[in-house]
Amino acid sequence: MSVAEYARDCAAQGLRGDYSVCRADFTVAQDYDYSDEEQAVWRTLCDRQTKLTRKLAHHSYLDGVEKLGLLDRIPDFEDVSTKLRKLTGWEIIAVPGLIPAAPFFDHLANRRFPVTNWLRTRQELDYIVEPDMFHDFFGHVPVLSQPVFADFMQMYGKKAGDIIALGGDEMITRLYWYTAEYGLVQEAGQPLKAFGAGLMSSFTELQFAVEGKDAHHVPFDLETVMRTGYEIDKFQRAYFVLPSFDALRDAFQTADFEAIVARRKDQKALDPATV
């Protein structure tokens, strides 16, 4: 799909982002010219969320925040990329908003993480329909400083297109959703912690997912994850719990995706409440 075609589709859906300045790979310049109000919104979001992440986030996420410096002001993507390259070889690229699957996977395969270059308004502190800079940056980027998870994300980008070609587009999306977006981890002898970006950037769901008495925690199994439906605009009805990032990487490396997709692609998605 061309940039122009995708821009028309996004406009028809009421999505934000200036796609008129996109390059062929859907990247744009960050154009660091944010208003005082945008900087204030960023600080408000970070101040509020870090009160929770300090208690509920996995240590690799917290280490990433400290090493990359994301809290005091809207980050300069190139400055953070310089730090991130030294840690795991990843870099940050600016995009106008959501981008098509193919270029997204290509960026991941080359250790480039797309980050939206605009920020939600003060009226959207609690909920925003589409991913913005706070979700992409505060949510996703810190854990990319963790070498094993960073490796998984690159492997995902390299393999996703092949899995889609097999007919597993919904299945590979579910895997991303339940790991990169809503993943939990509980290492041996340690309390349950969160790392997924959808949780890191949500004040209410982060608390529910980790501490809620009604949160449904399920041991991670790659094939089960790929079969389980998910929620878009409400709290998840299941959260998959990794024993470690190594377990995620190893499961992905050793999975026979051709066999999994052939076996499961025509089956109805599992109800997350009953997995």
Swiss-Prot record:
The record's listing under InterPro entries reads: ArAA_hydroxylase, ArAA_hydroxylase_Fe/CU_BS, ArAA_hydroxylase_sf, Aro-AA_hydroxylase_C_sf, Aromatic-AA_hydroxylase_C, Phe-4-hydroxylase_mono
Q: Which UniProt keywords apply?
A: Iron, Metal-binding, Monooxygenase, Oxidoreductase, Phenylalanine catabolism
Which reaction is the catalytic activity of this chain?
(6R)-L-erythro-5,6,7,8-tetrahydrobiopterin + L-phenylalanine + O2 = (4aS,6R)-4a-hydroxy-L-erythro-5,6,7,8-tetrahydrobiopterin + L-tyrosine
Q: Which Pfam families match?
A: Biopterin_H
Q: What does the Swiss-Prot or TrEMBL cofactor note state?
A: Binds 1 Fe(2+) ion.
EC number(s) recorded for this UniProt protein: 1.14.16.1
Q: Which residues bind Fe cation?
A: 135, 140, 181
Q: In which pathway does it act?
A: Amino-acid degradation; L-phenylalanine degradation; acetoacetate and fumarate from L-phenylalanine: step 1/6
Q: What is the required cofactor set for this protein?
A: Fe(2+)
- List the GO biological process terms: L-phenylalanine catabolic process
Which family does the record claim for this protein?
Belongs to the biopterin-dependent aromatic amino acid hydroxylase family.
Q: What is this protein called?
A: Phenylalanine-4-hydroxylase
For this protein's source organism, the top of the classification is: Bacteria, Pseudomonadati, Pseudomonadota, Alphaproteobacteria, Hyphomicrobiales
Name of the encoding gene: phhA
